Amino acid sequence: MEISGRKALVLGGTSGIGLATASQLAGDGASVVAASRDPGKALDGLTSGIELHACDVLDRDALSGLFSDQAPFDILVCAATGGARAAGPFLEMELDAYQGSFAKLWGYTNSVRLGVQHMTEKGVIVLISGAPARKTKPGQVALSSVGGAVEAFCRALAPELAPRRINVVSPGIIDTPMFGSLGEERTNKLEGATAGHPIPRAGTADEVAQGVLFTICNDLFRQI
């Protein structure tokens, strides 16, 4: 799919990977709508050509209204986290916190279920997951469970959506606002998390966004 001239909706598009993706889509000539619960977060890093909207992916009425107002569109990127994920040993974890981690899955579920009917016939959907879906460490039970569910959801749904396409981009450790505010603690967290990697640094939101755009553009992925 050529991006120039297309219309794209990026949910969770005002911070981190979502904002980087929205910016690159706009830079390549797409008309972009970026939505999140707090669109004001994007103002400092906003690229021209991006329209901001307030929308919570867990609010189905608001989401339906957004899709209806913006229809038809060609590209849907789901990068909204749905909130924090629980971390730490499972046997010490509050079960409500573990259950709450699945807000990301429900946000994606709402977005695809309500959005696909407003997309063009050969539209493309990209979901953002994460490496713990396939390779996990102690303390990542929630991350692994949610990511695995997102990826299974995508695989099962792909045949139903054809000729529209749905794919997952699943990055490793990425330096985004989810790691907290700037400072030594943030730096230490990122260095510790990537110390054993062949390339011992965190990835960037822009690097993940490049992968998202590659997935959108490469029609070979209709066969995957």
Predicted regions and their residues:
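N-terminal Rossmann NAD(P)H-binding glycine-rich loop of SDR-like oxidoreductase domains
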Residues: 14, 22-23
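A glycine/serine/threonine-rich, flexible loop-to-helix segment
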Residues: 174-196
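Catalytic loop of short-chain dehydrogenase/reductase
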Residues: 89-111, 124-162, 173-174
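Hydrophobic structural elements of the Rossmann-like NAD(P)H-binding subdomain
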Residues: 77, 126-128, 166-169, 179
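C-terminal substrate-recognition "lid" of short-chain dehydrogenase/reductases
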Residues: 201-224
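Conserved glycine-rich cofactor-binding loop
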Residues: 7, 14-15
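Rossmann-fold cofactor-recognition segment
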Residues: 46-61
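Conserved NAD(P)H cofactor-binding loop of Rossmann-fold oxidoreductase domains
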Residues: 77-87
